[in-house]
């Protein structure tokens, strides 16, 4: 299923449009996984103060802490930039794994949205991993 829970996969045009939008709004990163001595792209994340959409496309790699490591890295990036808060605009109600992962990284529910929850991470409330 696409990230938004729609039944039909995105068309190539939709995907191109999505990446153009994301590149304009934030820092777009491709997530890679080392497997058999080679780095393979497995997902992406875009980072800006107002949102952090992340996708790990390979189901066999879900639950291995990859997303958590990416989010922790982006929290450190937010500190470098000087942000005091960062947000996730919406995590869908059905996506309990993402809710748990973001909450484990220090994000807290901020407000109910149409399809889920908006989250905030107040950087002063969580430990700086770079000094640990």
Q: Where in the sequence are the language-model features?
A:
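Catalytic phosphate/metal-binding cores of nucleic-acid and nucleotide-processing enzymes, i.e., regions
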Residues: 1-3, 9-10, 73, 90-92, ...
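Active-site rim helix/loop that mediates acceptor-substrate recognition in acyltransferases
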Residues: 6-27, 35
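Conserved beta-strand in the GNAT
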Residues: 30, 38-51
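Conserved beta-strand-loop-alpha-helix junction that forms the acyl-donor binding cleft
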Residues: 88-99
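Conserved acetyl-CoA-binding loop of GNAT-fold acetyltransferases
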Residues: 103-113
């Amino acid at each position: 299923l696409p990230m938004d829970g729609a039944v039909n996969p995105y068309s190539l045009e939709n995907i191109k449009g999505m990446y153009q939008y994301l590149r304009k709004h934030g820092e777009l990163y491709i997530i890679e996984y080392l497997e058999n001595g080679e780095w393979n792209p497995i997902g992406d994340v875009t980072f800006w103060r107002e949102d952090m959409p992340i996708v790990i496309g390979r189901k066999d790699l879900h639950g291995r802490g990859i997303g958590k490591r990416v989010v922790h890295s982006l929290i450190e990036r937010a500190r470098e930039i000087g942000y005091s808060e960062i947000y996730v605009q919406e995590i869908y109600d059905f996506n309990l794994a993402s809710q748990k992962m973001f909450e484990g990284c220090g994000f807290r529910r901020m407000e109910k949205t149409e399809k889920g929850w908006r989250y905030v991470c107040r950087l002063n409330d969580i430990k700086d991993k770079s000094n640990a």
